[in-house]
């Protein structure tokens, strides 16, 4: 009997009969984290299609808390397998070309707590462990800096299965993700949309399937205020997985506070809806980000430019207007002529 079937049999049997399990089975590992983190010039939870300029770099350190991200149910019986979970993330990105940005993410599960799973024949979970590292490449397609109406980028990422299986921080195999992100101004606000697909190993808690892979469609939207002071953010995220009976939806609201032109703090929190594993009923995200970009390069004209020579301006001389010549008249010619008759 393969592990997923044995797991479901153990859970259902324990909930119905409530025996004391003597042989404990380790829960097959899968990645419980569902939050997509974005890098560079965008929000930490949603991409906006912008890229770092060549030579620019961005580093972020974030910590988050999740409440009830994994709950097993069987009728009225319930097992809070992961009631509380805290994790940290170190992420960085670098602008290579005007159309290419590379990034890396290193997550870590700091601690997690839940009900004792030995009642259903499961071994306890590890409280700490390394998460799934992610390597990412972002390709710029459109840019408002180039005079185009929107910012548009394509993200390609791969998650490496090197994390801790007992901490529910890795899949059985690598995960691949493709995502398109777009951003544009919307009056006094900055809006962004994203849509992507994730190919990952099938969740062992899902019903059995002939395929060991599962496809997941992820959508997101964000509205943010602009300015140099405190900026507000409102994000909506949704996921529709082939191995889940209902979608996963999260709403996050918060803000970003610049400390100086390169350093800023961010904080977001909000509820989650859905019974998909990894969807908490509440999530809190705090962190700090650092971004430094060189000034944009001067662009030089490639076409030949005719040479010019500076010369003193020659102003036309005004012609002198000479008064008409006055011819003297003898005085006697001015006197009245004598009348010869007198």
Regions found by a protein language model. Give the residues of each.
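Transmembrane beta-barrel domains of Gram-negative outer membranes and organellar outer membranes
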Residues: 23-307
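Cleavable N-terminal export/targeting peptides
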Residues: 1-28, 295-342
